[in-house]
Amino acid sequence: MIRILCIVLTLLTATMASAQKKNIPLVYNVENTGMRFAPPAMPHPTQLPVIRQLPNALEGVNGFDDWSKRRSNICHMIQHYGIGTKPSVESGQVVARMQGDTALVVNVSVNGHTLTLRSTIRYPKVGKPPYALMIGTSMISLPKQLFDNRPIATMTFHEFQVNDYSQWRKHHERGEHPFDQLYPHLKDNGAYSEWAWGLSRLIDGLQQLGSTRTKIDMSRIGVTGCSYAGKMALYCGAFDERIALTIAQEPGGGGAAAWRKSHESKEKVEDIDKTDYHWFLESQRENFHGDSVYQLPYDQHELCAMVCPRALLLIGNPDYVWLSDAAMLASAKEAYKVWERFGIGDRMGWSIVGGHGHCQLPESQWPEVQAFIDRFLLGLKTDTRNIQKEQ
């Protein structure tokens, strides 16, 4: 009798998970579904408890209906303690136009100042519009061959139009970037909050113009980038729910790699003490340096989890120790539990393979990327279950 009851309960659980999965969207038509929720209390860093393990991303979540609020709380924590505020924008503050057939121009006006974003859409030679779109943060480092014979348009988000910081070229300092002209009170922001804001404004422009004018299918937008731009892609994908697929390539510390795990590493990795602080709030280093990292109320697995229920693929390269891929793997496995909890584990995966240059995706990793692109940008019935490759 007990055995029969266990079988019935197992079948019932599987049936409920399957039914729930069918009702969970692949993407949304708004930037942030959690706007209706008030931010949680944000204690002073000295009042935060010590949490040695990776914090529970599913805290207070009993089912998918609870996820939007939990995701909103994570969103607020990351902004408050980590990267700074990504301000919301009213629709009337954005004016978009197509200049010719391929150039998207988006003007964003705030507080009497206007910031202009420009990007060229490169349309595919196959298929018919509206097309799926892959946006590269700074550039698309994925091999061109992955897009050549697929009906996917591509474009680049030129991040310097928002915050022109660069490790290698002349740039402005905090408070002097184009973004800061619109929001001078947010001059202490890290670049990742501002870059995420900028990419969202490009999507606003596409949404405003509509698919007839842009030839873009708004339900099939992806974002990708590598290294510092891999971090950027992850923040952009996490903070804008109109993005159906996020592919973060070799994002390193401050991207997918958990700060706690990087801190515990015996190797020279990018940890919370050794990263580029133009990207983050200076207060993050002041408040969470050294063992104080255990008082950080979230970790990077929760940034990854913010992408849920949409699709996320993390790509690593263990040959580059600085990237802290062991910490990324720990983060990926913890984040995966969120998708798994809702019966949609096939929407999240990772591939960590060495033997190649930085940001040079080898052919051995092409199948994972192709599977995610085909399913989540093209809507093909590609199997993305158990894409969890690691060396």
Predicted segments with their positions:
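Conserved strand-to-loop "acid loop" that flanks and positions the catalytic carboxylate
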Residues: C308-A326
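Non-catalytic accessory segments flanking enzyme active sites
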Residues: R52-Y123
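Short beta-strand element of the alpha/beta-hydrolase
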Residues: R118-I121, K128-S138
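Cap/lid segment of the alpha/beta-hydrolase catalytic domain
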Residues: G136-S219, G252-G255, W259-K261
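Mobile cap/lid helix-loop segments that gate and shape the active-site cleft of serine hydrolases
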Residues: A248-L303, S324, M328-A332, E340-G345
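Primarily recognizes the serine-hydrolase "nucleophile elbow" in alpha/beta-hydrolase
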Residues: R201-K266, S292
